[in-house]
Curated annotation (Swiss-Prot):
Highest taxon above the source species: Bacteria
Keyword Secreted tagged: yes
Upper taxonomic lineage: Bacteria, Bacillati, Bacillota, Bacilli, Lactobacillales
Compartments where located: Secreted
Biological function: Bacteriocin with activity against species of Lactobacillus, Lactococcus, Pediococcus, Leuconostoc and against B.subtilis and, to a lesser extent, against B.coagulans, B.cereus and species of Enterococcus, Listeria, Kocuria, Staphylococcus, Corynebacterium, Salmonella, Pseudomonas and Escherichia.
Keyword Secreted appears in the UniProt entry: yes
Thermal behavior of activity: Thermostable in a pH-dependent manner. Retains 100% activity after 15 minutes at 121 degrees Celsius at pH 4. Retained activity is lower when incubated at basic pH or pH 2.
Source species of the chain: Lactiplantibacillus plantarum
Name of the protein: Bacteriocin plantaricin KL-1Y
Length: 30
């Protein structure tokens, strides 16, 4: 349904932002 789609979309964006933040932290730290 639409709610499922919006949830998955938000989850995907959040996950991408999360991993981008991790990648930035890793490059800054190592």
């Amino acid at each position: 349904g639409r709610a499922d789609y919006n949830f998955g979309y938000g989850l995907g964006r959040g996950t991408r932002k999360f991993f981008n933040g991790i990648g930035r932290w890793v490059r800054k730290t190592f």
